Amino acid sequence: MAKTDYYELLGVSRGASADELKKAYRKLAMQYHPDRNPGDAAAEQKFKDINEAYDVLKDEQKRAAYDRFGHAAFENGGGPGAGGFGGGFGGFGGFEGGIGDIFEQMFGEAMGGRRGGRTERAGADLRAAVEIDLTQAFTGTKTEIRVPTRVSCDACSGTGSADKSAANDTCPTCGGAGRVRAQQGFFVVERTCPTCGGAGRTVRNPCRVCSGAGTVPRERTLSVTIPAGVEDGTRIRLSGEGEAGGRGASPGDLYVHVSIRPHPIFQRDGANVFCRVPLRMAQAALGGEIEVPAIDGTRARVKIPAGTQTGDQFRLRGKGFSVLRSTARGDMYIQVAVETPQNLTKRQRELLEEFEREAGNTASGSPEHEGFFAKVKEFFDGL
């Protein structure tokens, strides 16, 4: 049976912050805790699943691996909480980076990884999150984000060398191969050399600013274009905007996770938009035309037929969201809610009482009411 997505288990978007994850986890853990549900096997299993999901998503390295490989990132270790994954992966000590790095180091070129023998270590991929309004998701928007990253060292022009030269020596750890082997029980595991980062050579005269790495930590401000029609949880890839690669290697990518704030008027379902509109009782009974707001900022007029009931829907074609990578558009649905008047004046009460007397003397006008009481009569007649 396929495992449930960890983000779905916790009820959060893929761009959820650490605080949002913790809040969601605490709420669900309290709800499904075995002490609160004694003898409930389903609640106990749910509690275990919630803990498993939070154990992965609260850890940046595990979360990055899960975002990339899904549940497959943990299958060989028997699960995210298994012993082989604890404390830097137990028996797999010496693997720098996260779970994703382990997969790349073990299977490297076969998986199409960027790291290979005798090449500099490519820059790490980065994650960022942005939150936008529903109206911004409709129109598309540009937003700026600040990202802590590593950039090319200005002092050595990214070469890692104090004299900006290409002078280097054969790496003493891997002998120039760029990869080293380690015995792990019955297996011999090959991984990227931790000394030279896979380049096979080390800088002869390291830069004092970056210690030969070719990169330094810095915060960057980037402009992100969010397309019209983007959905909650969408991941946008900015190629080459991740960390700079060591000593001239290719940079990583930046993945921006988009979350959308709830709107006070509109709700969204795919490309369609829904708006709940209150109607006075007389409006619903008599019919007429009403003016409603549309998500594009305009106003639309909708004809309401006489006898409209709560729950009736009216469609405005093409007034919904645009569909990504398509010319199609969704629709807007007006959902009616008929309101019962409160705090009546004396005159209003008199009119309603007169209306009720008239309604009681007529055989038509309330088909659902009449149908219900006809069924009640049949029920008692059959006793």
Curated annotation (Swiss-Prot):
InterPro entries: DnaJ (IPR012724), DnaJ_C (IPR002939), DnaJ_domain (IPR001623), DnaJ_domain_CS (IPR018253), HSP40/DnaJ_pept-bd (IPR008971), HSP_DnaJ_Cys-rich_dom (IPR001305), HSP_DnaJ_Cys-rich_dom_sf (IPR036410), J_dom_sf (IPR036869). CXXCXGXG motif repeats lie at residues 153-160, 171-178, 193-200, 207-214. Its cofactor is Zn(2+). It is found in: Cytoplasm. Zn(2+) 1 binds at residues 153, 156, 207, 210. A zinc finger (CR-type) spans 140-219. Binds 2 Zn(2+) ions per monomer. Zn(2+) 2 binds at residues 171, 174, 193, 196. GO terms for biological process: chaperone cofactor-dependent protein refolding; DNA replication; protein refolding; response to heat. GO terms for molecular function: ATP binding; heat shock protein binding; unfolded protein binding; zinc ion binding. GO terms for cellular component: cytoplasm. Keywords: Chaperone, Cytoplasm, DNA replication, Metal-binding, Repeat, Stress response, Zinc, Zinc-finger. Residues 5-70 form the J domain. Participates actively in the response to hyperosmotic and heat shock by preventing the aggregation of stress-denatured proteins and by disaggregating proteins, also in an autonomous, DnaK-independent fashion. Unfolded proteins bind initially to DnaJ; upon interaction with the DnaJ-bound protein, DnaK hydrolyzes its bound ATP, resulting in the formation of a stable complex. GrpE releases ADP from DnaK; ATP binding to DnaK triggers the release of the substrate protein, thus completing the reaction cycle. NCBIfam families: DnaJ_bact, PRK10767.1. HAMAP family: DnaJ. Homodimer. Belongs to the DnaJ family. The J domain is necessary and sufficient to stimulate DnaK ATPase activity. Zinc center 1 plays an important role in the autonomous, DnaK-independent chaperone activity of DnaJ. Zinc center 2 is essential for interaction with DnaK and for DnaJ activity. This is Chaperone protein DnaJ. The lineage of its organism: Bacteria, Pseudomonadati, Pseudomonadota, Alphaproteobacteria, Acetobacterales.
